[in-house]
Amino acid sequence: MNPNLRKILEKQHYKIVGSHSGVKACHWLKEKLIHNRCCYKEKFYGIKSHRCLQLTPTINQCTQNCLYCWRYQDFTEQELESFDEPEFVLEKSIDAQRLLISGFKGDERCDKKMFEEACNPNQVAISLSGEPTIYPKLAEFIEVCHKKNMTTFVVSNGTQPEMIENLKPTQMYITVAAPNKEIYEKLCAPMIKNSWEKINESLDILSSLNTRTVVRHTLVDKWNIGLENSGEGSSPSRQISSKFVDEYAELDMKAEPDFIECKAYMFVGYSRQRMNLENMPSHEKIKGFAEKLSDLTGYEVAGEKKDSRVVVLAKDKRKMKI
């Protein structure tokens, strides 16, 4: 790993694992330990925020340079020339998580039982940074997690369909951050050829996977949800492009996911060098978008979490909890 990149990541409180992986304690893990406030994944799907291990097997490898990404992108690589074994990545990631949260043990606000549980995670969020499907042994890594009775969420940008069709996580996400190819190429800045076509192929594959599936729309105001000429002070629903919602609905129906997450871009990290605060949609606008998408897809609005600016739609909300 580039030593300058390592310094940047460590300053951001990442723990580097091996040669290409990383762990960072999630904001909501800390909130659960100190204030007993959970993330939207616990509220919607039932996983425990304080027992979630947030990691990436590709800390600096990606196929896109999305403008809204919080990642430092100057050292981005598109492949892994050599890679660590899945057992090593998981074991060292758990060790890293324990180090990251060790300071909470002496905090009188932290529940002791909850802290001990946090030191033994039972859920792995394979996202955080980079594109996880670049890791050639991702399928094996998921199997290693499951053998240890850990649930797995994989968040992918969908540009590697040949990998996605072989994955069996507990819950498989494809992020669709644009309604069409033109906006996708401007907003997501793909670094490989035919990326939009590959995402569409992944959406086709998603409908056939024998696991829980999610399409996530990361929504960026003035880019992939709002209209530049909507008018100052107009209502959130009037600031949403019906054409865009129609196009998103078409993509969603291709994938037939169990759930659709409509989530606001958050003005954090290095995205602040590429975006403005006004690009972060209000929760009201996200909710308006989700309601329009619900009307078009037939999916039910099944939950929302205002402080995360996210709304989830479900094909069958009785099946939301894992």
Model-derived segments and their meaning:
Residues 23, 53, 124, 213, ...:
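A broad, low-specificity signal marking well-ordered, structured residues that form hydrophobic/aromatic
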Residues 88-118:
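Short Fe-S-cluster ligation motifs
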Residues 1-68, 72-99, 314:
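Flexible, acidic/Gly-rich N-terminal and inter-domain linker regions that tether
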Residues 1-43, 207-210, 223-322:
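Auxiliary Fe-S-binding modules of radical SAM enzymes
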Residues 93, 97, 101, 145, ...:
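Hydrophobic, Leu/Ile/Phe/Ala-enriched alpha-helical segments that form helix-helix packing faces
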Residues 50, 119-121, 305-309:
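Short Gly/Ser/Thr- and Asp/Glu-enriched loop/turn motifs at secondary-structure junctions
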Residues 62-65, 181, 267, 320:
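Short, acidic Gly/Pro/Ser/Thr-rich loop/turn segments
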Residues 109-232, 236-276, 281-284:
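Conserved AdoMet/S-adenosylmethionine-binding subsite of the radical SAM
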